[in-house]
Amino acid sequence: MNNIEKCKKLTQERDWAGLFELNGLEIDSFGTKKELSVLGDYLQKDEVVFTLVSGMISQSETSTDFGFGAKNWITALTSERILCLDYTMLSSSINTQSFRLNQIQSVSASQGWFFGKITVDIGAGLIVIDNCEKPHAKVFAELANQLIRQKEED
């Protein structure tokens, strides 16, 4: 994995804009500013964020929001897992979903007319992150698959 030290430094500084820039992407904080502001609080000690993507993830059984349908989440690819955060508007609580890298079979990206989509295969099901910016989806999937391969080789 390239840029590990730079990613580590940016993660420690919580410089998410710098992380987007490092990956050759423009920051996408639309609808996820609150999630970005608390992301560092949900990381484990020495966990490194490699890339971020925002997109719509459907409500799950663990979601506590009163709303229905898909919500805008920030999803972080870290050295240990894929971490999804949704800051709920009404209760100011934060929904999280976390998938360890060793649970993940593959990550794929597809591109539509306007947006991209990321599909995470966890064996027992699929996690779909929809309405992502196309370049963000591509970078996320490429880096995720690199990390998964590295973890398998270790």
Regions found by a protein language model. Give the residues of each.
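A positional/architectural concept
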Residues: 30-32
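Extracellular/lumenal glycan-associated surfaces
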Residues: 78-80
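Acidic, Ser/Thr- and proline-rich intrinsically disordered linker/docking segments
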Residues: 2-25, 36-48, 57, 66-71, ...
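Proline/serine-rich, acidic intrinsically disordered regulatory regions in eukaryotic membrane-signaling
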Residues: 62-64
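Conserved binding/recognition cores within well-folded domains
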Residues: 51
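His/acidic/aromatic-lined binding-pocket segments of jelly-roll/cupin-type domains
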Residues: 73-76
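Aromatic sugar-binding interfaces of carbohydrate-active proteins
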Residues: 54
